[in-house]
Curated annotation (Swiss-Prot):
Gene behind the chain: ldpB
Protein name: Secreted LysM effector ldpB
Superkingdom, taxonomy of origin: Eukaryota
The organism of origin for this protein: Aspergillus fumigatus (strain ATCC MYA-4609 / CBS 101355 / FGSC A1100 / Af293)
Family the entry assigns: Belongs to the secreted LysM effector family.
Signal peptide segment: 1-19
The LysM domain, residue ranges: 46-91, 135-182, 211-258
Skewed-composition ranges (Low complexity): 266-283
SUPFAM superfamilies: LysM domain
UniProt keyword terms in alphabetical order: Cell wall, Chitin-binding, Extracellular matrix, Glycoprotein, Repeat, Secreted, Signal, Virulence
Length: 299
């Protein structure tokens, strides 16, 4: 093999390796393809449209998760970890485990601000940042949403996306030198709004809905369900218009249902209590006509 052939082979090899590193998959909070029949029920983030040559190691490296986590969330991969073409796989569930880092090393490379007042917010930040954010991290080149979560280890992927909706559902808009929210101040649960919707609602909203949420730019179905302490199944059942589109028809400035009034159970009408029939007894006086007739016969 000539020198030129060797160089071409090396370039092709490096190109293939680099393409594997930078590859992005379509991601969403709901699967778009077939899933593992035993997939984690609390899965909140999916990788979709897996290709024939994709490997488990590709997903693990890209999403910064371990083989144990990937298999735990997708049990069908346990035998040989072979991905199925066109399938969707869970890459984050609420039991997400995090790896600890050396505290000294972490402190030296973490550029963060905590306990800040509104007037002292770091800059720049992206739109939609959680209003009650009190801890920030300055994004560095090479960071990913997953690496930030694993570095701090005290919040989940769902929290991060809820606090930083502008980064996108697949972390495609995480920009270096911008500050992202990595912690919020505790606040009271959202207060129920009046029974009547205060604005436009999607079709299929149940008549007994008594709690609404106004959709904001950057909201997603999982984040809203998590905010109000309801399951994703409940959210979809109360807002059927968003389910067929995998939450893509969640429209800003519309109101979605996040709570319903309990329907009173039907109460059977009680049957009247039978009254005992009157019957003559030896102690009751004999009717007057009968008594008169007997006296005439005897006399």
């Amino acid at each position: 093999m000539g020198l030129t052939s060797i160089l071409i082979a090396q370039v092709l090899f490096l190109g293939a390796a680099n393409s594997a590193v930078v590859k992005r998959w379509p991601c969403s909070v709901s699967p778009t393809g077939p899933t593992d029949p035993s997939v984690a029920k609390n899965c909140g983030y999916w990788v979709n449209d897996v290709a024939k040559n994709d490997q488990c190691a590709d997903l693990e490296g890209y999403f910064d998760i371990s083989r144990e986590e990937l298999v735990n969330w997708n049990p069908s991969l346990k035998e040989n970890c072979r991905l199925q073409n066109g399938h969707s796989y869970c890459v984050a569930a609420s039991d997400l485990t995090t790896r600890s880092t050396d505290s000294a090393e972490e402190a030296s490379r973490m550029d963060m601000a905590t306990g800040v007042e509104a007037a002292d917010l770091p800059s720049p930040t992206q739109g939609g940042l959680a209003a009650n954010c009190n801890a920030f991290y300055k994004v560095k080149t090479g960071d990913s949403c997953w690496s930030i979560i694993n570095d701090f280890g005290n919040f989940s992927i769902y929290d991060f996306y809820r606090w930083n909706p502008s980064v996108g559902q697949s972390c495609e808009a995480l920009y270096p030198d911008y500050y992202v929210c990595i912690g919020v101040q505790e606040q009271e649960p959202p207060v129920a709004t009046p029974t009547n919707p205060p604005g436009p609602v999607l079709s299929g909203t149940p008549a007994n809905c008594n709690k609404y949420h106004k959709v904001l730019s950057g909201d997603n179905c999982w984040a809203i369900a998590n905010q109000y302490g309801i399951s994703l199944d409940q959210f979809y059942s109360w807002n059927p218009a968003v389910k067929p589109t995998s939450c893509q028809s969640l429209l800003p400035d519309y109101y979605v249902c996040v709570g319903v009034a309990e329907t009173p159970s039907a109460t059977a009408t009680p049957q009247p209590t039978p009254q005992p029939q009157q019957s003559s007894s030896p102690d009751q006086p004999m009717p007057q006509p009968i008594l008169s007739r007997l006296l005439r016969i005897l006399l």
